[in-house]
Amino acid sequence: MKIIRVSKNEMKHTSRGIFTYFNRKPVKMLKGGHGESNLQYLRKNGLKYIVNNVDINGVRHGQIDCHVRPRERKYNGHAWFPIQWNDNIIAKAGEHVANLKKNSKINDHMQMHGKYKKVYVVAYKSRGRICGICPKFKQER
């Protein structure tokens, strides 16, 4: 079985997020942004967000006012990995989940589920590569 990996470019999407820009300033968040670097980027650029609660395993839930998806702008519509998870740990979590035997037959762009360091993780793949990693919204206890 071929090992599924995540690219550096995909980690930018997953961790910091993808934005639209006006005059070289980010104005709307399109997708991704599940790492601490997303919160740092939002703060740096004066974009409003709220972390409403933190699960026992460190997964944070909240909202991002500049997100294009309405559900991400609402209470607990967005999830971030634990604060101590850097891009390297997020990548390892995504690769771990994508390479679980139970996920080997999952089609492209469908959710693959697994657990890594007490966090339930969702990963997506496309053409043999990971194209998205995020914490599962409902962290099981």
Where are these regions (language model features)?
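N-terminal "domain-start" segment
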Residues: 1-111
